[in-house]
Regions:
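Short coil-to-beta-strand transition motifs
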Residues: 2-7, 45-52
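Short, solvent-exposed secondary-structure boundary/capping segments
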Residues: 19-24, 61-69
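Short amphipathic, basic-aromatic surface patches that mediate peripheral association
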Residues: 27-30
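Short coil-to-beta transition motif at edge beta-strands of beta-rich domains
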Residues: 33-44, 78-85
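Ser/Thr- (and often Asn-) enriched beta-sheet segments in non-cytosolic proteins
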Residues: 42, 52-54, 86-88
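C-terminal structural segments of small proteins and small subunits
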Residues: 63-89
Length: 89
């Protein structure tokens, strides 16, 4: 029987040259951070609209997140350094 785990919160610390989000988990990840690659990420903008992304890479304590909207050239309202994103585990 699999148990439902709480999502992991992460704080946006920057962006890379491909406009992907760089985020650090707010608590230590017990498993190998690479186990989060492929997991769904949700950001709620200031209007409560959910924006979905995916963890693409894990580099030490930084996760690289790609949002479909940003890849399509769309800006996500309010997403910036210090924003909170949630990773489903």
């Amino acid at each position: 029987m699999s148990e439902e785990r709480e999502p992991i919160d992460a704080i946006v610390v920057g962006f890379d040259e491909q406009d992907r989000v760089l985020a650090q988990p707010t608590s230590s990840v017990t498993a190998d951070p690479t186990s989060l690659v492929g997991k769904e990420v949700v950001y709620l903008d200031y209007n409560g609209n959910p924006w979905k992304g995916v963890v693409r890479e894990a580099m030490e304590d930084v996760l690289v997140i790609e949002f479909e909207a940003m890849r399509a050239g769309q800006e996500i309202p309010g997403l910036g350094q210090g924003s909170l994103v949630r990773i489903s585990v």
